[in-house]
Design a protein with these regions (language model features):
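N-terminal beta-strand motif that seeds the catalytic metal site of vicinal oxygen chelate
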Residues: 3-17, 203-228, 234-235
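Conserved active-site tyrosine of GNAT-family acetyltransferases
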Residues: 31, 167, 227-232
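Glycine/Thr-rich beta-alpha phosphate-binding loop at enzyme active sites
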Residues: 36-41, 74, 79-84, 101-103, ...
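Glycine-rich phosphate-binding active-site loops on the catalytic face of alpha/beta enzymes
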Residues: 89-95, 128-138, 172-194
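Conserved small/polar residues in nucleotide/adenosyl-binding loops
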Residues: 240-242
Length: 242
C-alpha cells in the first residue's frame, strides 16, 4: 500500500504541532491507539524535524509526514529525518518538482484552477485545499472537480468532528486534515487518552459507523463481555455490560 492509499484509508490526517520533540512518540502512540496510523508533523515549530525523526525511529506502524513545508530546505530536511510525505500550504514548483524527482509523495495546497493545472502537469492526482473554510469548502471543491475530475482533495481548515462525515462522503475528497484530533494544548498537557478518544470519534464519524444492536455468539458471558469491550475500544459504542 503506497502513501496515497494509506492517507485515503485513514480518512483523517492529524495535523500535529509539537513544541518539544519529547512528546512526539507519545502523540504518535495516542493516534495509533485511536485507529489513526498517519500523522503530519508541521514545520511551524523548531521541534518539527527532531519530532519526525523520533516517530520514524520509534513508531514503525506510523506513517509520518511533514506539513507546513514552504521551502526546499525544509523539504529536504524533513525527508532526511524520516518524513514519508510532504504537505505544503501552497504550490511551490521547486518543492513539488524535487519531491516528484526523488519519489517522495507530496500534497501541495491548490485552491485555484491555475494551481491545480500546475500540479497535474507534474503528475499529481491529490492536492491539499487550504484553508477550506475560507475558500468555499465543499461547494468550491465540487465546482473544481467538474473540469478536474481526476483530482482529489485533502481539505484542511474548517473540518471538524461535526462535519467530517459530510466531507468524507463527497466523491472528490481523498481524506481530510485537521488539528482537532490532536490539540496542541492536550499534547503539551500530556492528555494523550483524550487524543486517542478524539481519533476514535473522528474515525467513526468518517466511516458513518452507527450501532443499533450487536449480537455476540460466545461460549460464555465472560467471552462475550471481552468481545464487547474490544468493540467499545475500537468504536466507542458504549460501555460493555453483562
Amino acid at each position: 500500500m503506497n502513501v496515497s492509499e494509506r492517507l485515503a484509508r485513514s480518512a483523517v490526517v492529524p495535523v500535529v504541532v509539537l513544541d518539544d520533540a519529547k512528546d512526539a512518540v507519545a502523540a504518535a502512540k495516542a493516534l495509533l491507539a485511536g485507529g489513526v496510523d498517519v500523522m503530519e508533523i508541521t514545520f511551524r515549530t523548531a521541534a518539527a524535524a527532531d519530532s519526525i525523526k523520533a516517530v520514524a525511529e520509534n513508531c514503525p506502524d506510523m506513517l509520518v509526514g511533514a506539513g507546513t513545508v514552504i521551502t526546499l530546505e525544509q523539504c529536504k530536511k524533513a525527508v532526511e529525518y524520516g518524513a514519508k510525505f510532504i504537505v505544503a500550504p501552497g504550490f511551490d514548483e521547486e518543492v513539488v518538482r524535487w519531491c516528484v524527482d526523488n519519489g517522495v509523495a507530496v500534497t501541495p495546497g491548490c485552491v485555484t484552477p491555475t494551481e491545480i493545472m500546475a500540479a497535474m502537469k507534474l503528475g499529481l492526482k491529490v492536492v491539499k485545499f487550504f484553508p477550506a473554510g475560507v475558500y468555499g469548502g465543499l461547494s468550491a471543491m465540487k465546482a473544481l472537480s467538474g473540469p478536474f475530475g481526476g483530482i482529489k482533495f485533502i481539505p484542511t481548515g474548517g473540518v471538524n468532528g461535526q462535519n467530517i462525515g459530510e466531507f468524507i462522503a463527497a466523491p472528490f475528497i481523498h481524506a481530510v486534515g485537521g488539528s482537532w484530533v490532536c490539540p496542541k494544548a492536550d499534547i503539551a498537557a500530556g492528555n494523550f487518552e483524550k487524543i486517542t478518544a478524539l481519533c476514535k470519534q473522528a474515525r467513526s464519524a468518517a466511516l458513518g459507523f452507527e450501532v443499533a444492536h450487536i449480537g455476540v455468539n460466545c461460549e460464555n458471558g465472560e467471552d462475550s463481555l471481552a468481545v464487547c469491550k474490544k468493540l467499545d475500544e475500537a468504536f466507542e459504542i458504549g460501555r460493555a455490560h453483562d
